[in-house]
Amino acid sequence: MKRSLWVMQVLHWAVMLALVQCGALGARRFRGGRNPQPRRALPSAHYRDRGETTESFSLDFTAVEENMDNFMTQVKNLAQSLYPCSAQKLDYDMKLHFLENTSVTCNDGTPAGYYLKESKGSKRWLIFLEGGWYCFNKENCDSRYETMRRLMSSSKWPQTKTGTGMLSSLPEENPHWWNANMVFIPYCSSDVWSGASPKTDQNDYAFMGSLIIKEVVKDLLSKGLDNAKILLLAGSSAGGTGVLLNVDSVSELLEELGHTNIQVRGLSDSGWFLDNKQYRCTDCVDTINCAPTEVIKRGIKYWGGVVPERCRQAYEGKEWNCFFGYKVYPTIKRPVFIVQWLFDEAQLTVDNIHLTGQPVQEGQWRYIQNLGTELRNTLKDVPAMFAPACLSHEFITRNYWTDVQVKGTSLPRALHCWDRSLQDTSRNNKSPPKGCPVHLIDSCPWPHCNPTCPTIRDQSTGQEMNVIQFLMHMGFDVQKMAHQQGMDPSKLLGMLSSGS
């Protein structure tokens, strides 16, 4: 009875706060203030099943531990009712800021920077590292500068940027992090966020990825990060690898500056690469065809690359190993959540498997299946991870990031469960929340055997394909594959259709 009364009191005061905020906003508009700004469509009712409270007021969840789901449903509905008020004054765009330390630059010497959307009252910060491959010698860096200058220079960066997926400010697109402070760091160092060498007369390009991250964190301290409770360092592709390389150093930097109460965590998306043998070995002449190990061996010298100290000690003299997730992960001290497609397109590209619409040879099929198996094996001891059996690359900034599921759980739900499990751990509660999985990996063995995978389109016609059409299109032999698996072809087709 006391708990129910407490919940109702919290909701009562929150509603009163909402009415005051709405009333004040309406009064300002009635008095003839600024012209009302056009605003985006409000979130659908579906958000009520997926949203989460903002951080405008503090809640003691331990008081309703036994009835948490019911309590959260009420608070989610409250957040939905609050949203129309806040939407009228919400600024969705992140704004460009250049680093105060102008000696830390992009490849071409232009100033590095970041995009920021502040969320007043929130003590959660999401710092995102952009991806975009790399270059590892003067020749392919020159080529990259001619064809992809945005990834090496800030000279034409726009003044604002709108976040998508997990960087979105819309609760229907980003149910658990929409009200966080959002930071997007553009990738302009071409060094997998590892470099620490400036541009000089001898060096045509600066490689300062690791320094850019540190300078952004320093600059953000004066913009509210000093009061943060949680800092989530996230990234996709090269940015995902950058998370693995930098999450501990970010935490150590904050501790050195006296901010010991900020919990630093990592979220690595599509950055868990394997140093496996290529399907077809080629000379290391460009970024795409060069074997992953050879790229990093050459790149780490060219960039003046820095790796985490514990990993450096584990692989002294062979520090290139630290760029591969399954090798660096055991040395990382901070909690990191891994998001990885089991059939990652970038991994297949560097392994010289090019799915361009031509029928895939039998040897390529075996290689692709083995890749999924290898990835599963490297992820089996990772406690917090989400690995769908899909053919894709990058995830958390896609607009479909809430739709893909593994074993009935979406990525936003898994991340929320992870967040809760870390909170419980900090309270010395060793057991994870019931019905809240954080170790999610598909077991089906083919690309796109999960029916919730992103849509595949025929490259020649643009038409959508289901998984069976896709596999047939790529030369998949149902009879032969069923025979290899020791099952009836119709049963195999049923499994592919259901994703089992």
Curated annotation (Swiss-Prot):
InterPro entries: PAE/NOTUM (IPR004963). Glycans are attached at residue 101. The active site is at 237 (charge relay system), 344 (charge relay system), 393 (charge relay system). Residues 1-26 form the signal peptide. It is found in: Secreted. Keywords: Glycoprotein, Hydrolase, Secreted, Serine esterase, Signal, Wnt signaling pathway. GO terms for biological process: anterior/posterior pattern specification; negative regulation of canonical Wnt signaling pathway; negative regulation of Wnt signaling pathway; neural tube patterning; protein depalmitoleylation; Wnt signaling pathway. One of its GO terms (cellular component) is extracellular region. The keyword Nucleotidyltransferase does not apply. It catalyses: [Wnt protein]-O-(9Z)-hexadecenoyl-L-serine + H2O = [Wnt protein]-L-serine + (9Z)-hexadecenoate + H(+). Carboxylesterase that acts as a key negative regulator of the Wnt signaling pathway. Acts by specifically mediating depalmitoleoylation of WNT proteins. Serine palmitoleoylation of WNT proteins is required for efficient binding to frizzled receptors. This is Palmitoleoyl-protein carboxylesterase notum1a. It comes from Danio rerio (Zebrafish). The lineage of its organism: Eukaryota, Metazoa, Chordata, Craniata, Vertebrata.
